[in-house]
């Protein structure tokens, strides 16, 4: 149970009381976890008495685990009960003891006051792209291209051929690897150098000065040998082609493909309308944003960047030093701050919209979305809450409110009422888990074929740099 102690301007203090029964339940959960994880000589796993385990890990450790578990659950719950959303907070917990209620106080700063401009008369003009017969035929043509086969050709290279080349070293030794290049997708300098050549020819490809990633490349020459020339063979658009993509017939392929294109077009239209409304809200709102809010968002974005680099085997200090050498560090930091402020403005506008429209997500809905999110990430709810932390759980709850408010506003502008709101939390939970709705398996197969072709082409061009 949360109780507001004081609220002056955007400064707030409140107290949360946790009943003794829930404290005991948290103790039981912690003891169960310790009994499972702590190995005590002379006892089978899970059979050691609590006193023995306590002597092994320390009473203070047990209490800290219980306290953290209670804070993880009841801090965010207290914020929801009081309708608070804090920029920053200091939590002061009392000692925790089995069989006794637990209390903690929170002092923090609420989000700034936001006033939205008039949006209810907005005419959202963004429309879903029209799926015409021409669009369908072009998509079928693309599928045909992606599923093309290649046959060895004993003739000079033509514009649509696949050409296997071998990079040569000094003295024309076969120093580099061999790889295919799809001429109709190749860079102009590669295409022009190879057209008209035949298998066995040695070709000098002049690569113009360019930037690849973070590296500047001066103009240079790559010497290659044409290993093999293959001509493209396109299948006819008939039932046999449809069957190769796991469709019953060409008619079925056309029908399903049109439905998929229309679904994607509708999704694109929805996204365009959302962005149009959000842009209008941000442009018309009045707000003074605390620098701490921008700084916190910037820190979060920086952490994401560092995590991405780490996954690629690059340390942030190395990347920072490289940008410094290139004279790009100041620009990077300025862009990061600007993007952080843009995201904060967007979130504040959507949160105020949800407040103005009295959009709500009840406890049952929120718990269900947490369960969906946990399952999507292969964990239980408690593990998810521990991973997200107090602020993460609250941020997730606020993201659901933002989504619900946006859906309600869009429905109001389109005259559709609130019919789409019920699905909001579940859909948002799935997106937050990083799992988008899957495409039909048959269409996905064709897309995978395309991806393999593009990857091979990309690899070929990169090795020619």
From Swiss-Prot:
Q: HAMAP family, per this entry? A: Trigger_factor_Tig
Q: Which GO terms describe its cellular component?
A: cytoplasm
Q: What does this protein do?
A: Involved in protein export. Acts as a chaperone by maintaining the newly synthesized protein in an open conformation. Functions as a peptidyl-prolyl cis-trans isomerase. Probably changes conformation upon binding to the ribosome (maybe in particular due to interaction with L24), exposing a hydrophobic crevice that is probably important for its chaperone activity.
Biased composition, class Polar residues, residue ranges: 435-465
Keywords, alphabetical:
Cell cycle, Cell division, Chaperone, Cytoplasm, Isomerase, RNA-binding, Rotamase, rRNA-binding
Q: How does it assemble?
A: Binds to the 50S ribosomal subunit via interactions with ribosomal protein L23. Also interacts with 23S rRNA and proteins L24 and L29 when complexed with the ribosome.
Which intervals hold domain PPIase FKBP-type?
160-235
Name used for this protein in its record: Trigger factor
Task: Give EC number(s), comma-separated.
Answer: 5.2.1.8
Q: Per the UniProt entry, what species is this protein from, by scientific name?
A: Deinococcus radiodurans (strain ATCC 13939 / DSM 20539 / JCM 16871 / CCUG 27074 / LMG 4051 / NBRC 15346 / NCIMB 9279 / VKM B-1422 / R1)
Classification via InterPro entries: PPIase_dom_sf, Trig_fac, Trigger_fac_C, Trigger_fac_C_sf, Trigger_fac_ribosome-bd_bac, Trigger_fac_ribosome-bd_sf, Trigger_fact/SurA_dom_sf
Q: What class of enzyme is it?
A: isomerase
Q: Which GO terms describe its biological process?
A: 'de novo' cotranslational protein folding; cell division; chaperone-mediated protein folding; protein transport; protein unfolding
Q: Where in the cell is it found?
A: Cytoplasm
Segments for region (Disordered): 412-465
